[in-house]
Each structure stands twice: as structure tokens, then as C-alpha cells.
């Protein structure tokens, strides 16, 4: 574990492996430890960089910057600090809010974008309709975050994982429990017009049993992302990388081999 002080945040991160750089951006139920099933898989061919967003793990905002600084700005400064000019970004859920704006605004820095269970901060009528229809699921997840429950159904994984993989369900909740109370909020402000000149190779993946950000929402995001490809994973909830790591790693590996080979 390494801590660095940026202008707006102290960031907890880890670097493993060698080769072209991949940054893994976790979701709201995790932190840099969440990627324990991905880093060993990719570190022989890629430099794997994991970090915790401010207020997650051991990362924190400096001087209450969370109300005025976006996660994408933190990521850009983080990359600059590490002197990484070009990178592949792997975004899980909330991590899409971190990564998609960077791919839109600075395509020369982002070689490839892998969007897992996330529409990022995209807003379209279809995405907004799906988000509204799924508000109950989001509320359940919010309560789980706040209460830090470890022994009950965690919406970020899903009921199937709770039943079929109780040890994984427990581990996920234990990692989640390392996070701090969250004060920052995510903006939803990218429009289809903002995506008109988009040119970053992008794949969206979605679990067909996702109750947090459902497949209809992810499909709608893929539809307005030029050149994007959509993959659906059956019998899987919101956290494909955690529930079905072999499937996740194979999909990501195939994408990287084509767009960002080691």
C-alpha cells in the first residue's frame, strides 16, 4: 500500500506487474482491494494499478474537496503524478463516473475503456427512465452501504451470490466495510451530444440479474457510445468481476488483446 497527496485528495494505491498500464476504478461497494481476482490474472502482461477513491479504503479528501472536485479530475491528477501518458481504464459501477469523462475529454490519454455494470454519468431519456424504474433497487443498495451489513443480502452482489457463494458474499461485505461514510455525490451530466465525437474503444458488460444498474440502462448507454460493444452475462448480478471473475477476466483480456495488446 502507498499513500500519495494530490491537490484535492490523499490516495491509497498499489502497482503490480509490468507492461502497458491498466487502472482499475472500483465501485461504491469496494475499494482497491476489490480487484484481488483481476490483478494476479493480468500482472504478468500489464502494469496493474489499483486505487481507492476518496472516502473509500484509506483514501480521503483534503479540505472537504469532495463537494467541488470530480473523481475524474482526481484520476487525471493521479495519472499525471505517476507519469502515465496512456492507459486502459477498467470501471466498475461508480468507477464509470470516474473513467468515462476522462475518455470523452482526453481520448489521447485513454487507449481503451471497459465499462462494467455502469452507464457512467451519461444521461439519455432511456437511461433516465431505467434509473427511475430501478429507484427501489438503488435505495436498497444505499441502505446497505450505510448500515454496513455483513450477514444479509447485499444488493451489490445479488441473491444468487448470497445463496451460491456465501464466502464470496461475506468477503465482499467485509471489503465494503473498510470504507468511510460517503459525503461526495455523483453528477449525471454527459449527454448524447457530448458523445458525438467519441473515439475511445469501449466495451460495456452487464449482469442480467443486476438490481442496482440494470441491463436496460447499460444497453442504453452502449447505444449512445459510438463504436461501443455490449456483452451480457447471464445468472450474474451487479458485480461480475467479483461473482464471475473468470468470465470478467476473459472478456477484459479479449478486449485488451484487440485494442491494447501487451
Protein language model annotation of sequence segments:
Residues 9-61:
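Conserved HGGG/HGGXW glycine-rich cap/lid loop of the alpha/beta-hydrolase fold
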Residues 40, 49-90, 250:
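Active-site loop/oxyanion-hole signature of alpha/beta-hydrolase fold enzymes
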Residues 97-105, 110-142:
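Flexible "cap/lid" loop of the alpha/beta hydrolase fold
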Residues 124-125, 129, 142-197:
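Conserved alpha/beta-hydrolase catalytic His-Asp/Glu region
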Residues 198, 204-206:
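Short beta-strand/loop motif that positions the catalytic acidic residue
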Residues 200, 214-223:
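Short alpha-helix in the alpha/beta-hydrolase fold that links the catalytic acid
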Residues 209-213:
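Acidic catalytic loop of the alpha/beta-hydrolase fold
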Amino acid at each position: 500500500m502507498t499513500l500519495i497527496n494530490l491537490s484535492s485528495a490523499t490516495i491509497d494505491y498499489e502497482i503490480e506487474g509490468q507492461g502497458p498500464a491498466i487502472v482499475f476504478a472500483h465501485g461504491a461497494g469496494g475499494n482497491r482491494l476489490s480487484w484481488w481476482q483481476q490483478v494476479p490474472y493480468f500482472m504478468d502482461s500489464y502494469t496493474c494499478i489499483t486505487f481507492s477513491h476518496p472516502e473509500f479504503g484509506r483514501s480521503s479528501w483534503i479540505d472537504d474537496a469532495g463537494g467541488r472536485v470530480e473523481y475524474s479530475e482526481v484520476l487525471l491528477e493521479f495519472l499525471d503524478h505517476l507519469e502515465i501518458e496512456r492507459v486502459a481504464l477498467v470501471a466498475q459501477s461508480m468507477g464509470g463516473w470516474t473513467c468515462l469523462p476522462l475518455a470523452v475529454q482526453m481520448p489521447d490519454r485513454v487507449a481503451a475503456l471497459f465499462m462494467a455494470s455502469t452507464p457512467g454519468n451519461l444521461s439519455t431519456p432511456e437511461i433516465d427512465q431505467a434509473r427511475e424504474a430501478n429507484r427501489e433497487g438503488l435505495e436498497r443498495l444505499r441502505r446497505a452501504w450505510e448500515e454496513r451489513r455483513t450477514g444479509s443480502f447485499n444488493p451489490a452482489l445479488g441473491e444468487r451470490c448470497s445463496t451460491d457463494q456465501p464466502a464470496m458474499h461475506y468477503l465482499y461485505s467485509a471489503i465494503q466495510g473498510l470504507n468511510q461514510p460517503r459525503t461526495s455525490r455523483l453528477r449525471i451530466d454527459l449527454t448524447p451530444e457530448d458523445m458525438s465525437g467519441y473515439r475511445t474503444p469501449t466495451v460495456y458488460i452487464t449482469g442480467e440479474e443486476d438490481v442496482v444498474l440494470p441491463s436496460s440502462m447499460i444497453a442504453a448507454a452502449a447505444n449512445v457510445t459510438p463504436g461501443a460493444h455490449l456483452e451480457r452475462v447471464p445468472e450474474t448480478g451487479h458485480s461480475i468481476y467479483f461473482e464471475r471473475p473468470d468470465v470478467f477476466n476473459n472478456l477484459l483480456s479479449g478486449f485488451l488483446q484487440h485494442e491494447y495488446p501487451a
